[in-house]
Amino acid sequence: MTSCNLTAQDIQLPEPTRKGGMPLMEAINNRHSSREFSDATLTNQQLSDMLWATCGYNRPDKRTVATALNRQEMSAYIVTPEAIYKYEPKENKLIHITSGDHRDVFAAQDFAKNAPLNVALVADLAKQDKKEFAGMTVGAMSNNIYLWCASEGLNTVTRASFNQEGMKKAMKLSETEEVLLVQTVGKK
């Protein structure tokens, strides 16, 4: 996954980079889907930047993506060959959920089963009673991942082919939490 040693513990990520990068219009122009990924891993800085862009805090109690009524019902989990982690945006930290390679549960396609990183976007429907609102938020989260990947010269693709029940079990989700989308991310 990253340049750090992976163990069955939480990982404090470095402060996300909030300035610089590719100009927005250039990132939009470069945005694309790709199903080709090397086995090279992202650095902790890249993970921090991507997850902050996905659903981090950019001002007090407000996220980088809009959430209807500011319910903030969405979470991001990362799935690596070594473990599953939940992103804790207030602390910019990865919370260890479980060890082991669970990528086969998160993907029906071979390219995603072998990719070094999958990002699962999860809605807690107890916080947001309208699934359509959660869908709006997950769309914004996914788009931020696409734009960040374009800015970094990385590949990504959004996927809806996954084992919902297997993922819920592997990620230890509650009854009210549901995976809405999975996005594979990696180097070319």
Q: Which ranges hold each PLM region?
A:
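N-terminal amphipathic, basic helical "cap/leader" segment at the start of enzyme domains
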Residues: 4-115
